[in-house]
């Protein structure tokens, strides 16, 4: 069994493209769909900040924004998870760079790859 977290950059909030409440609604619906299929996300972590944002409250060069490691540090601290028990699966280069910066393994997944191959890779890495 694994704990599953989402650590996501959400610059669209800082840029005024959508509201933080919209993102929370999306995460809520995602969680509902996962639960219908016997899965779940243990916790969502997000960075709504961007140095070039248009919304003053979110215009910030945050240490949480990947490829920086702030969100991973929070996950590790909040849940008492050691780095040797962490793996990051991401679809962007900034995700993979974040994992490197935090000294944990990573897998780049574009959503089109075979899920069985992904789970095989997870098993190999976490052994």
Write out the residue ranges for each language-model feature.
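Short beta-strand segments at enzyme active-site cores
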Residues: 3-9, 42-47
